Amino acid sequence: MSKRRDVQSVILATMVGLALLPVWGCANRQQAVALYVDAVELRELNNNDKAIDKLNQATKVDGRFSLAQSLLGEIYEQKQEYKKSAAAYGAATRLNPWSFRDYFSLGRVYQTMKEFTLAVKAYRRACELKPSNFEANLKTAQCLYEVNDYSQAIVYGKRAEKIDANAEELHQLLGNIYDSQKDYEQAVRSYKRALEMDSSNPGVMMSLAVAYLRTKRVEPAKELFTAVTQIQPANSSAYQYIGYCYLQLNDVNQAIDNYRQAIKINSYDWEAYRGLGVAYMTKANAENDAELKAQAVELWRQSLSVKPDQPRRDRLIKLIEKYSK
């Protein structure tokens, strides 16, 4: 039997009932099914443009044929034509409002497009259709986090956790949500759980270390940032944070060394310039060194040059004015 006959047999066997529904008449539905079969075969041959033509014909012949819209959504998504993909998946959900697959796919495309509010709406419907689906709950939580709806993000995150408590990605997300809510102790617990599942993940290590800093645990934060530099020697942010930790621990020379390393890696690290300026000024005041004081002021100016709209900008300008006299 030919490949075409194989494709036809499989698809038609699963669509017998659908194909015979008298929506626009059996002839219309059967013609649409035949065009759909052609499109599936063309897609298998990587001829997506011709497959799209067949599917568009199928939707014109039978405007209620949801499977054609669903496959159009898949093909457009594969081609990274996301607006067209969303339109097709949206049409599929309107034609078949009980299709988990189409709502989930619609949410995924909106999430890719960073249309997070629309993604939430689609994913929530997917969760209604399959409440025990881990990915649907996880992605709903992700998108709610993106739109700053942290309380609802926690709700869906916890639902996902009940389904699969061993997903590192989920615990990292929960850590991010708790951090955004300023619940830093919960954030620490979530990041620790994520790190238990992937002990060498530098992203999780950085997040946990920052959470440690926010809970005044400087030493374990420094150790984690240092571990990150062993995995990612070019991670300027890790060195910048190590510099900050050493400042908090009153080790100015180590702070200076690490801030310098951060700037060596990334000459646009405004936080490292600012922190190095603080370290120099601290050392200058301790040693009554006018030259170090001048260098500190110049570093602060460089920080503002790199990022003029940085947080606490006014405070830094006042320091520059104070020590420039």
List each model region and its residues.
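Bacterial N-terminal signal peptides
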Residues: 13-22
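Structural signature of tandem alpha-helical TPR/SEL1-like repeats
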Residues: 44-54, 79-91, 113-125, 147-159, ...
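N-terminal leader/linker segments that initiate helical-solenoid repeat arrays
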Residues: 25-71, 78-80, 94, 325
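Terminal, low-structured helical/coil segments at or just beyond the last alpha-helical repeat
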Residues: 281-285, 290-325
